[in-house]
Design a protein with these regions (language model features):
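Hydrophobic/aromatic beta-strand patches that form the interior of the parallel beta-sheet core
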Residues: 124, 145, 178, 218-222
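A conserved active-site cap/scaffold subdomain adjacent to cofactor or substrate pockets
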Residues: 226-228
């Protein structure tokens, strides 16, 4: 297998991190985002902490783990994970889950896996979300691999086949678990049905017949349940706009900085 075919989509290798960290640290847009997310820590200290990370897991434990547990502490009554159906912690799994929030779904899963003595997951993320170069770099530091969108039909087939080969390689050879949503985009109406195209994509890689290829992925269906949908008011707003404006299409990203009423 020629692993270089995955270079465009895979997470960074650990030996690539020092250069990527320096590129991020030198990026004014990343500096602004980092100081906004962690306002009480000087950026120089954040940069020093980044440079001390030797692996992607080091980075996740240094930054993501604490931030996600703080979100959980501040905005939830607690997180739980029932992992009893797949007790073998040494195996890699493909967690296919319903989808509510691209950061929290996979992030909460990863920190709960860490607390059970397991590795974090690699995350399938669409390139439509990677609107700035620093975001694309950061998610690949955070063990994400890229799902390419907005392609021609032929390009989409080629991209799907490559991603399937990468996922089979990740599970079988790297022994690294994966998180992927069961459908493209969030289920805004809570209709959590797995898209046929997701299963077809998984079966494009590997060897043997259809069942063999899917079995090779060690699929673990995952149901994520939030008392309140993390993006509920944004989804309601979009539904209303689609109802009231003929031909409405979501084309802009609205950022809200005021706290949610339920957090006050």
């Amino acid at each position: 297998m020629d692993l270089t075919e995955f270079n465009e989509i895979r997470p960074y290798n650990d030996e690539e991190l020092p250069q990527i960290f320096e590129e991020l640290i030198a990026d004014p847009a990343f500096q602004k985002a980092a100081t906004g997310a962690i306002p009480n820590v000087p950026f120089e200290l954040l940069a020093q902490k980044m440079r001390a990370c030797k692996t992607k897991l080091d980075f996740q434990e240094a930054f993501c783990y604490g931030i996600l547990w703080k979100i959980a502490a501040d905005h939830t009554a607690g997180l739980t994970l029932d992992h009893t159906a797949i007790p073998d912690k040494s195996k890699a799994y493909t967690y296919i889950s319903n989808h509510r929030d691209i950061i929290l779904d996979s992030g909460f899963l990863s920190i709960l896996l860490i607390d059970q003595g397991m590795d974090t997951v690699e995350i399938a993320i669409g390139d439509n979300l990677l609107i700035y170069p620093w975001i694309k770099k950061l998610v690949r530091v955070n063990k994400s691999f890229i799902v390419q969108r907005a392609l021609t039909m032929r390009q989409m087939l080629e991209s799907s086949a490559r991603m399937s080969r990468y996922m089979h390689y990740t599970i079988s050879e790297k022994n690294q678990s994966i998180w992927i949503a069961q459908r493209e985009g969030r289920a805004k109406d809570s209709n959590d049905r797995t898209q046929d195209s997701v299963l077809k994509m998984l079966a494009m890689g590997g060897e043997g017949d259809l069942i063999d290829r899917l079995m090779e992925m060690n699929i673990a269906p995952l149901a994520i349940s939030y008392e309140y949908d993390p993006c509920d008011f944004l989804k309601a707003q979009e539904f209303q706009l689609k109802r009231d404006i003929e031909g409405y299409k979501k084309t802009t990203c609205l950022l809200y900085t005021s706290p949610s009423p339920r957090d006050s």
